[in-house]
Amino acid sequence: MHGLLIVFEGVEGSGKTTQLQRCSDWLQANGMGSGLDVFGKHRPVVVTREPGGTSLGLGLRKLLLEGHSSLIQDRTELLLYAADRAQHVEEFLKPQLALGAIILCDRYTDSTIAYQGYGRGLSLHLIQQLNKIATGGLESDLTLWLDLDAETGLKRARQRGTADRIEQADLAFHRRVQQGFAQLAASYPQRIVRIDASKSEQEVHLAIQEIFRQRFSEWFQKLIRPS
């Protein structure tokens, strides 16, 4: 039985974490995660994140987000994210997918391309190779990109309280990150779906629901294919 990996991406303050949780609640309220789907298969709904989706990852998350910016070199940062992902894929994602779970993941490989590639200016080819190594080729079935102007998102994020290490970066960095997400969406239109995150929280949630409805038939045909 095969599960689904659905990723939520976006710049700081785009609302992706809020929307991921609302999506989880909606799926469970509609029978997923607590019963049988339309094909009689049990589909648990699980929520995870990168970095920090495993015990090892929690330590890496603290180092990456709470540490002082000048103490972590860009290539070191890239390798730490790759280490977190490699552990996450083997310890959590693959086992959950084998159980047929619908996984909602807060950030995945596209974030590394956008932040460390476009934002930090590291080699995109190198990042793509590291992503392949870390994931073993595991890609998302769907990535929801919550598209929000970088300046607006950064203001939202900083209003939450003390800015983390990534949020402390200047606006130019976050604009490059936004450009990276836009380029990825243009390059992979079947996998990455753009959501206008400038709309109200409820409007964004309804837009995500509609995307799920459009893809349910395709997804479940995949889920029940022979192993």
Regions from the PLM with identified roles:
Residues 22-26, 151-227:
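NTP-dependent small-molecule kinase module
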Residues 2-5:
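Pre-Walker A (Motif I) flank of P-loop NTPase domains
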Residues 37-135, 207:
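ATP-dependent small-molecule kinase phosphotransfer cores
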Residues 13:
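Walker A (P-loop) phosphate-binding loop of P-loop NTPases
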Residues 19:
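Hydrophobic positions on the alpha1 helix immediately C-terminal to the Walker A/P-loop
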Residues 8:
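Hydrophobic anchor at the beta1->P-loop junction of P-loop NTPases
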Residues 16:
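Conserved lysine of the Walker
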Residues 107, 111-179:
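A glycine- and Lys/Arg-enriched "phosphate-lid" helix/loop adjacent to the NTP-binding pocket
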